[in-house]
Regions:
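Canonical positions in the second alpha-helix
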Residues: 47-48, 81-82, 115-116, 149-150, ...
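Alpha-helical segment of the N-proximal tetratricopeptide repeat
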Residues: 15-57, 61-68, 95-98, 102
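Register position in tetratricopeptide repeats
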Residues: 34-35, 68-69, 102-103, 136-137, ...
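Canonical tetratricopeptide repeat
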Residues: 27, 61, 95, 129, ...
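Alpha-helical adaptor scaffolds
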Residues: 64, 80, 91-107, 111-149
Length: 278
């Protein structure tokens, strides 16, 4: 008999009492969180979800509190419940995706980000999470595809171009990398973090290539002569790609005291060619 009574739905009066308690607990959780008492806030909000197990917002709030307290598993569980109760709601899905990325659970993050794109097809947030996750999973082509979509949706955002530059650099496509870094530099405010990052990335690429170019020039006077005559063309012919600033710095490093008459002499026979005559 007692079991049957507990299985009966609450009376209207009891339901009103429980809803009022849930509201008080929700407000108390907010107050406690504002005071930095996250553990107590989580306890209050958890009780709200027990009173209202079908309330997606209650689980969403619990998930945010747990994430702030770095209780990752509990946060993921609460946010998943929220997305299950309200599958078309954007905010819980974004919070869940972000939590999974922060926890380095990239496969799961990809799944949630893809689900988010079904809700918000033009979501830059979802694509940002996808590009990070694909990069960490070693899926560079997919990461490039997603960042390409980000550039298309928001072409004036220098951060998108910088990320594409990083991906192109990882794929050893220096021409594309320099192009994207240069765009990021041109679009950024000189005091912004993106400007600094793009400037440092270009300088690093330029410095690495400049060392290789100067080494080649020290061993091949014919290449050195071509550098003196047409720097950009000579660099490109050898497969290098420097930024405008890199070309300017290289120009000042080329030894211009190299005798002009040496260009009239035939190029020396390489060791490989000489070997054929032995």
């Amino acid at each position: 008999m007692t079991l049957l009574l507990t299985m009966l739905p609450p009376s209207p009066a009891e339901r009103r009492r429980l809803l009022a308690r849930a509201r008080r607990l929700t407000q108390r959780a907010l107050t406690l969180a504002g005071a930095g008492k996250l553990a107590e806030a989580i306890q209050c909000q958890d009780e709200v979800t027990a009173i209202r197990p079908e309330d997606a917002t209650a689980f969403f709030r619990l998930g945010l509190l747990c994430r702030e307290a770095r209780r990752t598993e509990q946060a993921v569980e609460a946010l998943r419940r929220s997305t299950h109760l309200s599958p078309g709601d954007r905010d819980p899905r974004e919070a869940l995706t972000e939590t999974l990325v922060e926890a380095s659970r990239y496969e799961e993050a990809v799944t949630e980000a893809r689900a988010l794109l079904k809700i918000v097809p033009k979501s830059l947030f979802a694509r940002d999470a996808l590009s990070i996750s694909y990069l960490q999973l070693g899926k560079l082509d997919k990461a490039l595809q997603v960042t390409g979509e980000m550039v298309w949706l928001d072409p004036l955002n220098p951060g998108h171009h910088f990320r594409r530059g990083l991906l192109f650099q990882q794929k050893s496509n220096l021409t594309a990398a320099v192009g994207e870094y240069s765009r990021a530099l041109d679009m950024s405010h000189p005091e912004s973090e993106t400007y600094t990052d793009a400037e440092e990335a270009l300088e690093m690429l330029d410095d690495d290539q400049t060392r290789q170019i100067l080494l080649l020039a020290s061993e091949d006077w014919f290449f050195l002569l071509k550098l003196r005559r047409d720097l950009a063309e000579a660099v490109t012919e050898r497969g290098f790609c420097l930024s405008e600033g890199g070309l300017a710095r290289l120009h000042h490093l080329i030894p211009h005291e190299f005798p002009d008459w040496i260009g009239d002499r035939p190029a020396p026979i390489s060791w490989g060619a000489r070997g054929r005559y032995h």
